[in-house]
A protein has these predicted regions:
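Ligand-binding pockets and gating/stacking loops
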Residues: 1-306
């Protein structure tokens, strides 16, 4: 399945040209492309949603000359060589995000009205995953550098996101110890525990007031999501994960502290690319920061948290 190990002649895209005191990442060359990428007809469509917290200066992003001959803004100029393959969109309107300050992540992908008495709706990534998810081991992948979530289920419950690159890599590409039988026993135990939780919660629900029942219902929805994912994991037990070259594993299967934000983000982005290349998932959300605060970015001269 993986193009990483079966096509030994492929050059890693992060291979660097080193000399005269600098390092430069190579552009995408033909020798870096896997054979399966030769034909666009066979390529699945993928979606990745990356959230930049605390806003941006829209004047630096917006396209001021539209149409086929559009001109990229200053901050988007590094995409110039790809301009024929992308469509920048400006002027989107998100009225339900007004006035919620540092909680915009809650409705960024749902567009729903959200408040103390409102229930969120399904996020666009999960709508897409509902169509493409049956074809991959993971219907979607939820990532966040500080745990704040973007994906929302059809019942309005936020899906958990992982922030540790090593945990993400192992979940995608490392077979659990003990073989298939041990994995199946572990999943069966999880299902049994979930059944007990659901059974106890149903009996408790009749004793609660309206507000508490609503909160319990949201909790039970989250439990059911875990149950669905557990059953899905069991259905994929007989399908081996792709084998990843040890050099690539060494670069990506590691804990990267947030204090090294540039390294952290590059590692997460590379894991996303690898997940797409091996078709482990076709939908990803990645929240790159926390609303209201910002970590130091030593690579660009920001040496302390904000």
């Amino acid at each position: 399945m993986s193009t990483i190990t079966t096509q030994k002649w492929l050059m890693n895209r992060r291979y660097a040209l080193k000399g005269i005191g600098v390092s430069m990442a190579l552009p995408m060359l033909q020798c870096m492309r896997p054979l399966r990428a030769a034909s666009n007809k066979d390529q699945p469509k993928r979606s990745v949603f990356i959230y930049l917290p605390n806003g941006v200066n829209t004047d630096d992003y917006e396209i001021h000359k539209a149409g086929p001959e559009y001109e990229l803004s200053r901050i988007l100029s590094p995409l110039q060589s790809h301009r024929t393959n992308i469509t920048p969109i400006s002027g989107l309107y998100h009225p339900n995000s007004f006035g919620i300050a540092h909680k915009a992540t809650n409705t960024w992908l749902t567009g729903a009205k959200y408040g103390p008495t409102d229930r969120n709706s399904i996020s666009v990534d999960q709508l897409i995953a509902g169509v493409s998810g049956s074809k991959t081991r993971f219907p979607s992948l939820e990532l966040s550098n500080q745990g704040h979530r973007l994906a929302v289920s059809a019942d309005g419950v936020q899906l958990p996101a992982e922030k540790n690159p090593s945990v993400v890599f192992k979940e995608l590409f490392t077979e659990p110890e003990g073989g298939i039988d041990k994995q199946r026993r572990r999943l069966n135990r999880r299902e049994s525990m979930l059944d007990l939780v659901l059974s106890d919660a149903k009996s408790l629900s009749n004793k609660l007031g309206k507000e508490d029942r609503g909160r319990l219902d949201q909790y039970l929805t989250a439990v059911r999501e875990v149950e669905i994912r557990t059953k899905r994991a069991e259905s994929w037990l007989e399908t081996p994960r792709p084998k990843i070259d040890s050099k690539i594993s060494g670069k990506l299967n590691r804990n990267v502290p947030l204090e090294k934000l540039g390294d952290y983000l590059r590692t997460m982005y590379d894991i996303i690319v690898l997940a797409f290349e091996t078709d482990m998932t076709r939908v990803v959300t990645f929240n790159t920061g926390n609303e209201g605060t910002g970590p130091a970015v030593p690579e660009i001269g920001v040496k302390r948290d904000r």
